[in-house]
Amino acid sequence: MKNKQKVSSDKFTMMTQMPVNKLICKMAVPTIITMLVSAVYNMADTYFVGKIGTSATGAVGVVFSFMAIIQACGFFFGHGSGNYMSRKLGEQKTEEASEMASTGFFSSFAVGVIIGVLGLIFISPLSKLLGSTDTILPYTKQYLFYILCGTPFMMSSLVLNNQLRFQGSAVNGMIGVTAGGVLNILLDPIFIFVFKMGVGGAGCATMLSQAIGFVILLIGCTKKGNIRISFKNFRFKKQLYKEIFRGGIPSLARQGLASLAMVAMNRLAGGYGDAAIAAMSIVSKIMNFFGAAVIGFGQGFQPVCGFNYGAKKYDRVKKAFWFSVKVTTVFMTVVAVFGFILSPYVIALFRRDDTDVIAIGSFAFRAQCISLPLSGFIVMANMYLQTIGRAKAATLTAMSRQFLFFVPALLLLVHFFGLTGVEISQAAADVAAFLFSMPICLKVLNIMMTEENKIQ
């Protein structure tokens, strides 16, 4: 017990006394790796299934929207419980953090079981609801069957990973997620081609990879200094679920609305042909890859923010925030410059033989490169507000980029400029989201620093 208290004390000392620049970089390396691995193996999954045929590829695309919903629920419980845990650990209230860890985990697993069972019962209507045509419906059901079986593991793995991250143990989370991702890449061709399971093999590989990653993450929770998951710590308390809701609803809003926004863009782009859909899809994948690095860095910032906010070391929170904004802005500016210059070559890596795709994608990519440097502040502002428990402000800023501004910009710009409107809509939404988020974030920062002055 004394050893465990010493480890917890050592972690508290590190999180609240180590220079924030060094601390954030230490926390961010494993989270960046985790995010990039996830981005890469999602692209690899699509690559292998693409060799089966167009209908199989379409089925994976249809089910991917359902997987985004599972992820949104996982982030809801993971960020909701994790934010609260980091603040309580900063206050050195380990018992309350332990109750939240177990409550968040078991709640997510139960919701995953319910979604999985209901999905299996209604798999045909669910497949059609997600957008399956009669041609791809058989493939969708094959793939979706395994995804539904793995839903509890997928959802609760996201919770465990985020809880470990908010405790300052991102390396343990990285190991679990990376192991699952690498295993998925290895199993995909084996199940699809060697075992001749087709698209169902891709789903089976994903399910097994998620289950094994889940076990590794659970083991990570038993490492010294980490909070163990135990059913005896589960509490069906209104206050705990209120905190999960406060901390998790911004993530649910961001992830869920982003999926709806993507559907809207694909529908409008579809009016200009398959090349437009393909081009915008390629640009989205590229942007998501670089965005994953920014989110990964932000996930390194969040536990530092949560611990020090809980410990009332507001000056360290402010320093951590602005350091994170500077690093991500510089990174995205470099990406934007090279992306703008090399745009046609980057798009051609994905679809070299279609000049229409390259032309449409290059213009859209360059348009987004113009607003790309603003994304660092937008992401960090949202993560800061979410971590300190400003649920309403965090939800608004989370919704702003992909819904409040993107969908109206898309509809308006398409009406006036046609396909060009589709290509520039995300850049326009980014500028609006930046102008919207900045005053909200700065106001909350000023309120926090006023509290710092009162303490001193």
Feature names for model-found ranges:
Residues 1-28, 85-152, 194-249, 305-371, ...:
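Short alpha-helical transmembrane segments in multi-pass integral membrane proteins
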Residues 36, 40-58, 127-134, 190-197, ...:
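Helix-terminus/linker motif at the lipid-water interface of multi-pass membrane proteins
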Residues 78, 147-165, 175-181, 202-215, ...:
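Short runs within selected transmembrane alpha-helices of multi-pass transporters and secretion channels
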